[in-house]
């Protein structure tokens, strides 16, 4: 058989040659400034990767083999989960059975503490096959042991095979402490009780690491991962110190992680997570390497969901679910697109469910095992994320561990700082949400929708906790400040008109008018674009005839010296005058009294707040 190499006539090109060619094409623009992506995650991303960039050992890694970078099993079947806030048992039961009949094979019930009674569980789970459907329960920490006892008793009464029932009891006392400010120093005893109660159900996990709430609060990817690892290690250490074998503890921990819209980095995050967790558990010397597997449930982010242009939320959650599926997680929840402003409708829940079913039955992602394996880019991202997360993890451990950091407010402050950094970037459109701070729907109204309130209303007190007034985790969506701005405009009862006075150079006036329309429409203003005016006088006359509240001069930098001052003087105090751009003659224009300029460096949020104030909104 002839094994002639393809392209043997072409000599190999080195990485240095590629870089030199890029530098040449940049024509003097600094390579590092233009081509290196300086991420917020603590590492840089190169413009290209080659075989020599692959981390050592990854070429021999296999799915289902320690340290499980490529997945916990030699297949990629994940569970499609949907969450139900259980109130009325019959209603929640009907919802669950309808979802199961239409492709969902994992249900998560959120149950208030006051509902934990012997009568409630049979009514909630009536007619649901606990052996074929994964059942997960998020119960108030103060009632979790009682609930678990009642659940096991129910399974026995209904003659389910306890070796086959599968699911989780989401006991996460540190997570509760983080959001409530109530310290729980006695959680180890609860873990011991839960492990004992669920010992008869080997496919149940009773300890949860809910790092998805960090994602929802604005944590960076490496930050969420590092904290999740330290969080899990805290439970692992406490339980083994209490005498529970490491294999038992590790097999009882489930990680509930968030998924941001950073597609490739999220794929890499989950791969890095499995690798690092396997190596952490290995340090405890388990009897079986299978105890080192990190079981991950992935939840699409709420941090980037928006009130306005809410259908775009479907697109966000679709790419997020896709990245988690490619990464090989065990189960996925897609948040319904309307969860920002209402209890999700049946339509929204159906779409959320179908988003995953499309990935399975139409895209066939469940038929491909770790397609990212061997990718120069994703393998390098995996290594970079792992290295940065490990560094942060070790810093937490050296400072006394995760629980100590939570009690002192260190974790909450760090995540809040990250969220604030991201909001600052969002205000300047360095971070973008389509339909909110960029490319808004000009004619959209809220239709009475307002952000849904969040909070614990479990209906009971948390056993083993004490009030400390500790710092709580601030969970705030990225879009909220812009949404409030737009809602304020609506509530004012009038919609300010922003008129584009386009004049001069055709390309520049169109570009600046488009920029200005997008800029001002994010506050809910009515924007009036124009093809162009022959003279300043013509443009000003049209603006005043339109009863414009704001007039934006759109032209080229060179022509502003000619047009801006006459236009400003003609407008006078009849409207707010803005120049679109940052022309060289800015100082001269300011001396003439022009104070409002908008450009790509503007803080969009603060500029719009100032305009609202001037408009009396």
Task: Name these PLM-found stretches.
Residues 42, 103, 159, 277, ...:
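Conserved, mostly hydrophobic/aromatic
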Residues 1-16, 34-37, 43-68, 330, ...:
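Intrinsic disorder at enzyme termini
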Residues 219-225, 260-272, 301-314, 342-352, ...:
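Short glycine/threonine-rich loop-to-helix capping motif typified by GTGT followed
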Residues 202-239, 315-393:
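Mobile "lid/hinge" segments at catalytic clefts and subdomain interfaces of large enzymes
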Residues 36-44, 170-174, 210-216, 251-260, ...:
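A glycine-rich phosphate-binding loop feature that marks nucleotide/adenosyl-phosphate handling sites
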Residues 454-455, 459-528, 541, 590-591, ...:
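ATP-dependent carboxylate/acyl-activation modules
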Residues 1-262, 292-297, 325, 331, ...:
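Catalytic alpha/beta active-site cores
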Residues 229-232, 256-344, 351-352:
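Glycine-rich anion/phosphate-binding loop at the beta-strand->alpha-helix junction
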């Amino acid at each position: 058989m002839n094994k002639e190499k393809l392209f043997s006539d072409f000599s190999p090109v080195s990485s240095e040659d590629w870089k030199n060619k890029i530098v040449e094409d940049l024509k003097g623009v600094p390579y590092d400034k233009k081509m290196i992506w300086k991420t917020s995650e603590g590492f840089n991303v190169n413009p290209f990767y080659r075989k020599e960039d692959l981390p050592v050992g990854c070429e021999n890694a296999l799915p289902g083999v320690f340290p499980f970078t490529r997945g916990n099993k030699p297949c990629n079947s994940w569970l499609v989960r949907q969450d139900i806030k259980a109130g009325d048992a019959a209603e929640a039961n009907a919802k669950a059975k309808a979802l199961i009949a239409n492709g969902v094979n994992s249900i998560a019930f959120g149950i208030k503490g006051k509902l934990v009674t012997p009568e409630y569980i049979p009514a909630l789970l009536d007619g649901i096959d606990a052996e074929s459907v994964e059942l997960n329960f998020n119960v108030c920490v103060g009632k979790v042991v009682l609930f678990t006892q009642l659940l096991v008793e129910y399974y026995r009464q209904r003659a389910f095979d306890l070796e086959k029932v599968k699911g989780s009891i989401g006991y996460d006392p540190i997570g509760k402490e983080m959001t409530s400010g109530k310290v729980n120093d006695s959680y180890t005893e609860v873990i011991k009780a839960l492990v004992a109660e669920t010992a008869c159900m080997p496919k149940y996990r009773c300890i949860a690491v809910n790092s998805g709430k960090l994602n929802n609060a604005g944590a960076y990817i490496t930050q969420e991962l590092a904290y999740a690892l330290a969080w899990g290690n805290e439970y692992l250490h406490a339980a083994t110190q209490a005498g529970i074998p490491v294999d038992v503890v590790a097999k009882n921990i489930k990680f509930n992680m968030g998924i941001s819209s950073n597609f490739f980095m999220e794929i890499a995050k989950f791969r890095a997570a499995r690798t690092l967790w396997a190596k952490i558990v290995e340090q405890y010397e388990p009897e079986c390497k299978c105890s080192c597997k990190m079981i991950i449930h992935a939840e699409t982010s709420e941090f980037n969901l928006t009130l306005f242009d809410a259908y775009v939320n479907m697109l966000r959650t679709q790419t997020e679910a896709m990245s988690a599926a490619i990464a090989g997680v065990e189960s996925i929840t897609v948040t319904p697109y309307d969860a920002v402003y209402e209890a999700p409708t049946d339509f929204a829940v159906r779409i959320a469910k179908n988003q995953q079913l499309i990935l399975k039955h139409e895209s066939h992602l469940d038929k491909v095992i770790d397609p990212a394996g061997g990718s120069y880019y994703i393998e390098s991202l995996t290594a970079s994320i792992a290295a940065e997360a490990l560094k942060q993890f070790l810093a937490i451990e050296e400072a006394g561990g995760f629980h100590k950091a939570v009690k002192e407010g260190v974790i909450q402050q760090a995540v809040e700082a990250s969220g604030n950094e991201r909001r600052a970037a969002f205000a300047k459109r360095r971070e973008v949400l389509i339909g909110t701070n960029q490319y808004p729907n000009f004619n959209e109204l809220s239709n009475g929708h307002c952000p849904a309130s969040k909070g614990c209303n479990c209906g009971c007190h948390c056993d083993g906790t004490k009030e400390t007034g500790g710092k709580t985790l601030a969970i705030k969506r990225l879009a909220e400040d812009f949404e409030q701005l737009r809602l304020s405009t609506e509530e004012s009862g009038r919609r300010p008109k922003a008129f584009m006075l386009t004049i001069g150079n055709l390309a520049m006036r169109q570009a600046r008018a488009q920029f200005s329309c997008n800029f001002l429409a994010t506050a809910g203003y009515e924007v009036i674009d124009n093809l162009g005016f022959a003279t300043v006088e013509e443009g000003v006359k049209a603006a005043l005839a339109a009863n414009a509240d704001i007039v934006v001069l759109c032209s080229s930098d060179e022509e502003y010296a000619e047009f801006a001052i006459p236009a400003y003087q003609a407008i006078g105090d009849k409207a707010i005058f803005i120049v679109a751009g940052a022309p060289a003659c800015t100082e001269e224009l300011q001396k003439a009294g022009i104070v409002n300029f908008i450009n790509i460096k503007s803080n969009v949020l603060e500029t719009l707040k100032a305009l609202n104030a001037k408009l009396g909104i």
